[in-house]
């Protein structure tokens, strides 16, 4: 039998419409994890979701005249292995932009 050491892991999922803001947030999280002696893996890019909206230009007839609008949701995953209490405190105090949605799983 092999004895496997159970590692603690924090998985952080980030979502944003702006890719640059998302990458800056990922860099801050990884830098914080590295400063507290935790191992950070990532950011792992996930597929970008595109949502396309079709709007009629004319209020009455002319169905051939349409405009298309889209929103793109960029996503990333960061895994932090062997976090200490100092790592968790530093991540809680981290100031990230409001345009980035963050989901943390322990």
Curated annotation (Swiss-Prot):
The keyword 4Fe-4S does not apply. SMART domains: Ribosomal_S10. Pfam families: Ribosomal_S10. GO terms for biological process: translation. GO terms for cellular component: ribonucleoprotein complex; ribosome. InterPro entries: Ribosomal_uS10 (IPR001848), Ribosomal_uS10_dom (IPR027486), Ribosomal_uS10_dom_sf (IPR036838). The keyword Nucleotide-binding does not apply. GO terms for molecular function: structural constituent of ribosome; tRNA binding. Keywords: Ribonucleoprotein, Ribosomal protein. Belongs to the universal ribosomal protein uS10 family. Involved in the binding of tRNA to the ribosomes. Part of the 30S ribosomal subunit. This is Small ribosomal subunit protein uS10.
